[in-house]
Amino acid sequence: MELILLQKVANLGALGDKVTVKPGYGRNFLLPKGVAVPATEANLAAFQAKRAEYEAKAKSELDQAQARAAKFEGASVTVSAHASTEGKLYGSVGARDIAEAFTAVGLPLEKKEVILGEGPFRLIGEYDVLLHLHADVESTVKVIVQGVP
């Protein structure tokens, strides 16, 4: 299935690229989300007519993501969780907990933007967490997990 991308898609292509994907990926993910359109002559002509509009929108989204990344630069948050005396958490601290903690201190963050490379934290301590704010913008923040008896 050949598609024209209307925005940058990680591991696939950039705005305006004509890509070939498996039919299920195109039909069930890219097309319903409005990320791509079928690569027909009519759609190609319509895309070329609106290319400047799509590029301006992509630039605006990138600028907003970079502004958000600047706010997160050097930011840290403390998350408290019940823990044993050895420092093991009775539960875990995951992406949702981290997103809620940053939102509570005035830095709005969604769960899907938090990237935990090795899964949720199960021990108290300091961790560096990657935030994926845009396809081209990432930021690293510090999360301190404190144990509460």
Curated annotation (Swiss-Prot):
<dbReference type="GO" id="GO:1990904">
    <property type="term" value="C:ribonucleoprotein complex"/>
</dbReference>
<keyword id="KW-0689">Ribosomal protein</keyword>
<keyword id="KW-0694">RNA-binding</keyword>
<dbReference type="InterPro" id="IPR020594">
    <property type="entry name" value="Ribosomal_bL9_bac/chp"/>
</dbReference>
<dbReference type="GO" id="GO:0005840">
    <property type="term" value="C:ribosome"/>
</dbReference>
<dbReference type="InterPro" id="IPR036935">
    <property type="entry name" value="Ribosomal_bL9_N_sf"/>
</dbReference>
<dbReference type="InterPro" id="IPR020069">
    <property type="entry name" value="Ribosomal_bL9_C"/>
</dbReference>
<dbReference type="GO" id="GO:0019843">
    <property type="term" value="F:rRNA binding"/>
</dbReference>
<protein>
    <recommendedName>
        <fullName>Large ribosomal subunit protein bL9</fullName>
    </recommendedName>
</protein>
<dbReference type="GO" id="GO:0006412">
    <property type="term" value="P:translation"/>
</dbReference>
<dbReference type="InterPro" id="IPR036791">
    <property type="entry name" value="Ribosomal_bL9_C_sf"/>
</dbReference>
<dbReference type="InterPro" id="IPR009027">
    <property type="entry name" value="Ribosomal_bL9/RNase_H1_N"/>
</dbReference>
<dbReference type="Pfam" id="PF03948">
    <property type="entry name" value="Ribosomal_L9_C"/>
</dbReference>
<dbReference type="GO" id="GO:0003735">
    <property type="term" value="F:structural constituent of ribosome"/>
</dbReference>
<dbReference type="Pfam" id="PF01281">
    <property type="entry name" value="Ribosomal_L9_N"/>
</dbReference>
<keyword id="KW-0699">rRNA-binding</keyword>
<dbReference type="InterPro" id="IPR020070">
    <property type="entry name" value="Ribosomal_bL9_N"/>
</dbReference>
<comment type="function">
    <text>Binds to the 23S rRNA.</text>
</comment>
<keyword id="KW-0687">Ribonucleoprotein</keyword>
<comment type="similarity">
    <text>Belongs to the bacterial ribosomal protein bL9 family.</text>
</comment>
<dbReference type="InterPro" id="IPR000244">
    <property type="entry name" value="Ribosomal_bL9"/>
</dbReference>
